């Protein structure tokens, strides 16, 4: 009913999760454009409480982010995925490639989207890259390209999240990419396919983009776990800006911040909020 209650205790354990449910904090610390798999309740309240107690926050710009999220609605926690098409190119808003798409691990993928202007990457491919008997995506319960690709793409095109064109130049114009740069990027990729000298060293799934129709899908990063937080002792006691223990205050779970204790490694027990 909104009544405030004061609870007195010898100690308090703050285990309020991360801030992946707060678009404001994700924009502040991580990305200009971002989606999230975090529950709506994980809004970073615990960080504000600890800052009020004098605990500085560190590594807040670290998070477990993945590539290829499609913003299908106004809710940044409701989205689709797209980056697994056979041989597809990752193109930024300047019409340029940024990585070896088939040789990228999760860290390279997240860095690619993080470094792209406005965190926007277009997944670009041609009809030649579609394998009829393959899944639309590499994971999940999707059917085959033959069954589900066309209706799914049509739904994205209607929402202004994907484009289809008969030529590379036409695709660039529809998406709003610099035509000369984009066509040169595709030409360089096709030359690499023909001569075995891909500009980014790619040697797998080298399928030339020679014949249309051509497609582009707008994608942004999506976050699963945020990895920053206050510093603490080995006993999970929170430290102030002088490195001294704030008496009676402990932290546990995602608010600890994986980056503070494990660098780029994922640590079990710090991402259980996504199970809610």
Where are each of the predicted segments found?
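Core beta-strand elements of the Rossmann-like FAD/NAD(P) dinucleotide-binding domain
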Residues: 2-11, 245-246
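Glycine-rich loop(s) and the adjacent beta-strand/alpha-helix scaffold that form part
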Residues: 7-70, 271-276
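Fold-independent oxyanion-binding glycine-rich loops
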Residues: 10-11, 15-18, 53, 93-94, ...
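Short beta-alpha connecting loops at secondary-structure transitions
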Residues: 31-35, 72-78, 151-157, 262-271
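Short Gly/Pro-enriched turn/cap motifs at secondary-structure boundaries
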Residues: 37-40, 77-82, 113-114, 219-223, ...
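Glycine-rich phosphate/pyrophosphate-binding beta-alpha loops
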Residues: 66-70, 106-109, 222-225, 254-272
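A glycine-rich dinucleotide-binding beta-alpha-beta segment and adjacent secondary-structure elements
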Residues: 181-264
């Amino acid at each position: 009913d909104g009544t405030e209650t004061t609870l007195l205790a010898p100690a308090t354990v703050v285990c309020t999760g991360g801030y992946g449910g707060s678009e404001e904090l994700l924009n502040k610390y991580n990305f200009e454009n971002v989606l999230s798999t975090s529950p709506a309740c994980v809004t970073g309240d615990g960080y504000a409480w600890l800052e009020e107690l004098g605990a500085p926050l560190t590594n807040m710009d670290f998070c477990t982010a993945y590539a290829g999220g499609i913003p299908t609605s106004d809710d940044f926690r409701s989205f689709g995925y797209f980056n697994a098409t056979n041989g597809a190119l990752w193109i930024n808003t300047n019409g340029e490639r940024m990585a070896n798409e088939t040789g990228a691990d999760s860290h390279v993928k997240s860095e690619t989207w993080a470094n792209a202007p406005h965190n926007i990457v277009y997944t670009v491919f041609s009809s030649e890259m579609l394998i009829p008997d393959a899944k639309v995506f590499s994971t999940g319960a999707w059917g085959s390209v033959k069954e589900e690709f066309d209706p799914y793409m049509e739904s994205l095109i209607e929402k202004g999240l994907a484009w289809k064109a008969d030529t590379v130049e036409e695709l660039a114009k529809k998406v709003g990419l610099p035509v000369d740069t984009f066509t040169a990027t595709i030409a360089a990729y096709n030359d690499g396919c023909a001569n075995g000298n891909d500009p980014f060293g790619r040697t797998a799934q080298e399928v030339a983009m020679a014949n249309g129709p051509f497609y582009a899908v707008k994608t942004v990063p999506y976050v699963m776990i945020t990895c920053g937080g206050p510093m603490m002792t080995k006993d999970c006691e929170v430290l102030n800006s002088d490195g001294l223990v704030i008496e009676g205050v402990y932290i546990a779970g995602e608010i600890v911040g994986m980056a503070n204790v494990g660098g780029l490694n994922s640590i079990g027990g710090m991402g259980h909020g996504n199970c809610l």
